[in-house]
C-alpha cells in the first residue's frame, strides 16, 4: 500500500511547487496527481455559460473520478489521468499514465474537502499563505 500525501491551500499558495519538490526528493518512487486535472467537463454547455463557472468551488471537480483513480493506484492498478483545457472547458485524454508507486502526492484546492478522499490520506498538509502574496503569485502565474 502506498503512502498518500494530500497537499491543500488557497490558489497561489505553492501547492504544486511543494508537491514537485517532494517528488524531486523521491523521483523513482513517487507520483503526483493534480486535482485540476479532474475539473468537470463542460463541453455540454455553451461557452458563455462555461465561462461563468466557479472553479474555486468543490462542485467544479469530479471528485468521484479522482477517488476512483486513487483507489486504483492504492490497489496497484495504473490509470490514465485526464487533462483539462481552460480554453474550451473540456476534459481531455492526456495519455498521462499514472503508475502505482510507494508515494502518491495529491495536490489541489479541495483535496481535504471530501471525506472519502481525505480518509485515504496518510498525511494532510495545508499551506497557509497570506492572501496578498497568493494574489501576487496567481497574477504572475496566470498572465505568463
Please tell me what each predicted stretch does.
Residues 26-28, 120-121:
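Short, structured coil segments at secondary-structure junctions
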Residues 31-34, 40-88, 103:
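Conserved nucleotide-sensing/catalytic segment adjacent to the nucleotide-binding pocket
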